């Protein structure tokens, strides 16, 4: 394989869970540690447009829908940003995704509500002063300004959305996920049908990597 499969699976799961609109559109990083190294995904960055903090018209607000595995973008007449869409065609990649969710990510999410409540208590005084200092209520300039209210209401909405999203993810990445897949298996972990894969990096750059076939799927 020409990629660090686990890093791609982890990056996918984080992007899918929070429905980050910027995934592969901007602030997306990957690296190789030398010419002979595989391609690693990460580190994660720029999540201000995640967790239901984006306009619904962008398609990133439904806690009961797949997002990251269906990302596509139309540029210069070409469909790009389809990394996860293509990787999901490979049963081996789906196996890694399912294993990483069930054994690594899911246990971490079990205490998310308690952690959120701890932060709510810690930040209470600062949050109140934030609204006083900046007069944030009902002000334009944020993607979800039409739904802004008290900071407590915002936290409640966040917790409700996360609860729904986590429940969906747990149901989605069961054992059947590996078998049914997203689309028919047609690729290898070493290459996407020997096609070039394009990754958007900022507004003015587009990097292309060609991954050669290595490990058959199925």
What are these regions (language model features)?
Residues 209-214:
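Acidic, Ser/Thr
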Residues 1-25, 31-186:
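Middle-to-C-terminal accessory/interaction subdomains
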Residues 204-208:
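Intrinsic-disorder/low-complexity, polar/charged segments enriched in Ser/Thr/Lys/Arg/Asp/Glu/Gln
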